[in-house]
Amino acid sequence: MQQSTPYLSFRGIGKTFPGVKALTDISFDCYAGQVHALMGENGAGKSTLLKILSGNYAPTTGSVVINGQEMSFSDTTAALNAGVAIIYQELHLVPEMTVAENIYLGQLPHKGGIVNRSLLNYEAGLQIKHLGMDIDPDTPLKYLSIGQWQMVEIAKALARNAKIIAFDEPTSSLSAREIDNLFRVIRELRKEGRVILYVSHRMEEIFALSDAITVFKDGRYVKTFTDMQQVDHDALVQAMVGRDIGDIYGWQPRSYGEERLRLDAVKAPGVRTPISLAVRSGEIVGLFGLVGAGRSELMKGMFGGTQITAGQVYIDQQPIDIRKPSHAIAAGMMLCPEDRKAEGIIPVHSVRDNINISARRKHVLGGCVINNGWEENNADHHIRSLNIKTPGAEQLIMNLSGGNQQKAILGRWLSEEMKVILLDEPTRGIDVGAKHEIYNVIYALAAQGVAVLFASSDLPEVLGVADRIVVMREGEIAGELLHEQADERQALSLAMPKVSQAVA
């Protein structure tokens, strides 16, 4: 039975970043002794809200109320000391330190200026026992499994007497046994009267654990379900879908040529089952899936960033042996990676160097001297044609916006003889104007006969740009939709794991 007074309330929370409104007027309540799930598409605002709750971000508008008091945290340490803990996918622990040291990091017990190891291990042992674990608190963390690391994170929260514990996609790296153990612990925490926030795309987990579900859409509050007997998979999907696809993406029907790219039972690290698909010359195929679907992993394998473990890639009906990126480039297949800053650009080099670095080898003079004339002309051509906003070709690319960095990467591949382009989250972190310019480049490439395979977690973008949508779910293909027939409800239903009897 729901209590009359909420323990945690969000009141009109808004968050704006430069050029991006991440959250708008978020208001809802959470109660002690309940698991409250947060759901929504990628980018709906769930993680941003958790970062506000935990002191990572300050809200632009609104307030967080805990146990009747308006709270504001300067950082995550202040939030943790006030009883608010977030358990992220990427666990924030120190592998070289012991379990006990990680649990009490920042508040190690001292005696005469020296860490009191006996007391430290005793107190940590109590927290470990509380969670039903059988681990020596003096064990270095690096020797434990990911599931055990997660238990240490929870023990760390309990050591601060956390009354609010939020889990952000906590099962993404866990085995089935570890998931069962996590659920056991969460249910115990609920019995103790704590507020549990739970973020997951996995429907079966949501239904197995939740007492209430709040749905977000485009940074806005949609609805809170409190009667779990009256909510099902379709009702949640319907709440998460609420926007028609307009003509803002500029898609138009086009004709295609012969098959240009084919994957025949391809497997790569992170791809659970063999993937087979084909893309024709001039066709744009979108890969859609939720967190952990395997889209990026598939593209990295195709490009030689990781090793394909089974199957074959064909370009123009010819088998391609891809063991490293240079093999893919030589075959005419290019990749714009998801993390453009870490894997796409060379930050401390100029725009000119970033555009020319791949094709440079073909234009050296005498086999060893850089052809400065060609490089200047090529860089200037792509800066103009792609409307890259930069003071000049010699500007360090790290000083450009994300959209202009992405256009420079596209310019790099336009300097090559391209047959296939793989685009992984091509517009992530890019403003609206630059997005439209990227879409126009994609359409232009298709018009030139390039086969385009692009992955995006932005469902409206996939539906708005792609001629055909391939939906991935947990490392396998869940279905395929044509542009003219696809809608958000269909795609999201395919992308989400169905409720099964596996989780009780």
UniProtKB/Swiss-Prot annotation:
It is found in: Cell inner membrane. One of its GO terms (cellular component) is plasma membrane. SMART domains: AAA. The lineage of its organism: Bacteria, Pseudomonadati, Pseudomonadota, Gammaproteobacteria, Enterobacterales. It comes from Escherichia coli (strain UTI89 / UPEC). Keywords: ATP-binding, Cell inner membrane, Cell membrane, Membrane, Nucleotide-binding, Repeat, Sugar transport, Translocase, Transport. Belongs to the ABC transporter superfamily. Arabinose importer (TC 3.A.1.2.2) family. It is an enzyme of class 7 (translocase). It holds the Pfam family ABC_tran. Coiled coil: none annotated. This is Arabinose import ATP-binding protein AraG. SUPFAM superfamilies: P-loop containing nucleoside triphosphate hydrolases. InterPro entries: AAA+_ATPase, ABC_carbohydrate_import_ATPase, ABC_transporter-like_ATP-bd, ABC_transporter-like_CS, P-loop_NTPase. ATP binds at residues 40-47. Its EC number is 7.5.2.12. CDD domains: ABC_Carb_Monos_I, ABC_Carb_Monos_II.
